Amino acid sequence: MTSFKHLALFLLPALLASGCTHASPADNAMACFENSGQDFSKVLSCYKQAAATQPLDYTPTGSTAFPGVEKRSFQLKSQTWTGHGYASPAEWEHTVDIYIPEAALHGKALLIANNGTNVPIADRPISAPTDFTQAMALAVAEQTKTIVISVSNIPNQYLTYSDDGVPRREDDSVAHSWALFVQHPENRPFVSLHVPMMLSLVKAMDLAQAELKPWQIESFIAAGASKRGWAVWLAALADTRVSAIAPFVIDILNTHAALEHTYNAYGKSWPLAFKAYHHEGITRQLGTAEFAQLMQIEDPMLYAKTEAGERLSIPKYIVNASSDDFFLPDNARFYFDELPGEKMLRVAPNASHYGISAFVEHSLVAFTNRLQQQRPLPSLKSVVQPEAGGARLAMNFSEPPTKLVQWRAHNLTDRDFRQPCGIHYEATDISQPEGQDLNVALKTPEQGWSATYVEATMADGLVISTPVQVLPDTYPTWTPKQIEPACKNLLDGA
């Protein structure tokens, strides 16, 4: 009888000639993209579809008992991603911690995109996540009776890029991946770091469903901050298991308009927080076809007229910082009203980009409880009506708030409300309206600019806000003054 080995040797040339070989996920993703007619809005779905052919790869690493909560830990290998051959290590790994409270609710879990460093370099060791701590996870699980899944190392970092041999993390890594994309978009559709970040969440959902069968988890509330909040948006667009989202401090939807607004509000300059994107030349790419192609992948608002557009209708709790280092306080003007479906906005007062962590636990508890109890999200509709000396903010509430506060900041010289620039929002209590409608007068300052919004607290502690209004709605012709090293702006070409 002919041995299997000899038979394989005999058949191999014929199999190769016929094309019957197993293509890699990267090859399959690229073939999908080419078959779509190089439709960049299909990049996420092509990458996810190609990765689905690979077996789920994870290992249990132990469990820990806390009062009222059990933590089960796993090591997940989510994918092999090289950024079209530019980034290493290629194997992405994550610590996945699943917090199961006593009497945990069935059907729906909370999925957290977390940070962390898992690839050390000479002077930077491995570090645990800080966006969403174990204490936060335990508190949210206990207070909501919801299983909480924390996925660390999104993105994996440090990643070393072969074009220059530099190890990068966080925005340095994202910005460099974008720079590689805009050089050759058609050849590198999957090189943006947000693409594998999205898939990390997809694979974590696969793991959770495999390990949590007694709780019959079918859907996930996904949350994350900053670039991880961006990954949450993309995961929601790509995977129907994401049934609701809570993105924190990623106030950049309708990205091109928001970036133009930023550039003009800072007197044709960029905030210091954009340093990585400025250094990589991304800020000089806004008007190019290549940047527009990148945004077809990145900007959730551009999916509205695509097959994934209906995903924008899932419940959304968008939590922004009033004093963000990256984003202007009134960026929501470019997207919030246009978003379909149930939606809420919260503006965290006197919070910087990194200070949002103080608001994460409370926000997630209130949002998750609403969803688990299948209660409608409160609606706060607001309209700004110009009038002499300022404007009138007209509001309508779907349910009566228990507390109303007007927050206002004033900058005498610049349209700049970043925390490092010495700006502080002052609170003024507002009397409860007799009905569902409320009107608040907004005064245009005689000098400089003001930023104002109204915050409403509901009976269950859920906090929502109107979008921030900046008056006058004009742009300065000068760059903001530098008060301290962190209050600085960058000029293109400098």
Regions found by a protein language model. Give the residues of each.
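Short beta-strand element of the alpha/beta-hydrolase
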Residues: T95, H106-T117
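Cap/lid segment of the alpha/beta-hydrolase catalytic domain
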Residues: V119-P129, A141, K145-L199, N254, ...
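Glycine-rich nucleophile elbow surrounding the catalytic serine of serine-hydrolase chemistry
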Residues: G224-L234
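Surface beta-strand/loop "capping" patches
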Residues: F367-R408, A427-A441
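Hydrolase active-site cap/lid region
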Residues: L234-R284, R346-P349, G355-A358
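Serine-hydrolase catalytic core
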Residues: A289-P349, F397-L404, T413
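Catalytic-loop region of hydrolases
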Residues: P25-H106
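Gly/Ser-rich "nucleophile elbow"/oxyanion-hole loop immediately N-terminal to the catalytic nucleophile
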Residues: Q183-S226, V242
